[in-house]
Amino acid sequence: MREIYRSSIFKKWIKDLRDSRARHRIHIRIKRLEEGNHGDCYPIGEGLSEMRINYGPGYRVYFKDTGKEIIILLCGGDKSTQQQDIVKAKQIARLYDKE
């Protein structure tokens, strides 16, 4: 089982999500990711991936798989904010790369 690290931005996004069913579905997908099942995920560049949750407005979770035992959840959003979220995820990942 892999370790999942959640950025503070991701934690705030998931906490502020009003749709409890969506939040539950996202947590299930993260659990599957932790178990090694990436499911509906696509690379978005710079070593990052987008996990698609086909529910509601099309939720997305952006993450970095370090290749070790750690996956970093960077941020989340939905289809309507996809391009801005990708830019934000890449910025957050660069900060983690510096650490």
Feature locations, PLM:
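Secondary-structure transition/hinge residues
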Residues: 18, 34, 97-99
